[in-house]
UniProtKB/Swiss-Prot annotation:
Species annotation: Bacillus mycoides (strain KBAB4) (Bacillus weihenstephanensis)
This protein's name: Pyridoxal 5'-phosphate synthase subunit PdxT
Entry similarity comment: Belongs to the glutaminase PdxT/SNO family.
Subunit structure: In the presence of PdxS, forms a dodecamer of heterodimers. Only shows activity in the heterodimer.
Entry GO MF terms: glutaminase activity; pyridoxal 5'-phosphate synthase (glutamine hydrolysing) activity
Gene that this sequence comes from: pdxT
HAMAP family for this protein: PdxT
Length: 196
């Protein structure tokens, strides 16, 4: 069984743990840097990206997270997690982890009162997935090797680049675990390749 960590500094941690377990993997809440060595994949949950960055800096997680990304182990960023994974952020000079060759705009759909749900078609996952958008970012631009998995209107809301997956929405806030299951499969495949 693969072991998937959920970065436990802030955000919808408990919901991600439940979704990972429902998808047949072991879930671990990561609160210490050394735990990164024990896991096969990592979820960066939604939350408030500036608060999350402050906590990442406070607990000296940034370099270990970048090292984890370079190791080739899969990472999945949802909402604020997408912002953490992006190489370029509109209106900000420096990236956070910067593992995905994507450009992201923060709070692109508006503030909290503009939160909404939308039925999405997601490549590799299926139709009618309810995306919960809360002060959501979206992807403005992608490199050639980034696969766009889902659009909402004209906006890219789910993308994949090799071992990295990012979504504007919160897949963990519904009882539909298909997006998490897709990530669990990514982690299983990556682990199999390491064994071979």
């Amino acid at each position: 069984m693969v072991k998937i960590g959920v970065l436990g500094l802030q955000g919808a941690v408990r919901e991600h743990v439940k979704s990972v377990e429902a998808s047949g993997a072991e879930a671990v809440v990561v609160k210490r840097i050394e735990q990164l060595e024990e896991i096969d994949g990592l979820i960066l949950p939604g939350g408030e990206s500036t608060t999350m960055r402050r906590l990442i800096d406070k607990y000296a997680f940034m370099e270990p997270l970048r090292t984890f990304a370079k190791s080739g182990k899969p990472m999945f960023g949802t909402c604020a997690g997408m912002i953490l994974l992006a190489k370029t952020l509109i209106g900000y000079e420096e990236a956070h982890i910067g593992a995905m060759d994507i450009t992201v705009e923060r709070n692109a759909f508006g503030r909290q009162k503009d939160s909404f749900e939308a039925a999405l078609s997601i490549k590799g996952v299926g139709e009618d997935f309810v995306g919960v958008f809360i002060r959501a970012p979206y992807v403005v631009n992608v490199a050639d090797d980034v696969e766009v998995l889902s659009m909402h209107g004209e906006r890219m809301v789910a993308v994949r680049q090799g071992p990295f997956l990012a979504a504007s929405f919160h897949p963990e806030l519904t009882d539909d675990h298909r997006v998490t299951a897709y990530f669990v499969e990514m982690v299983k495949e990556a682990k199999m390749k390491k064994v071979v």
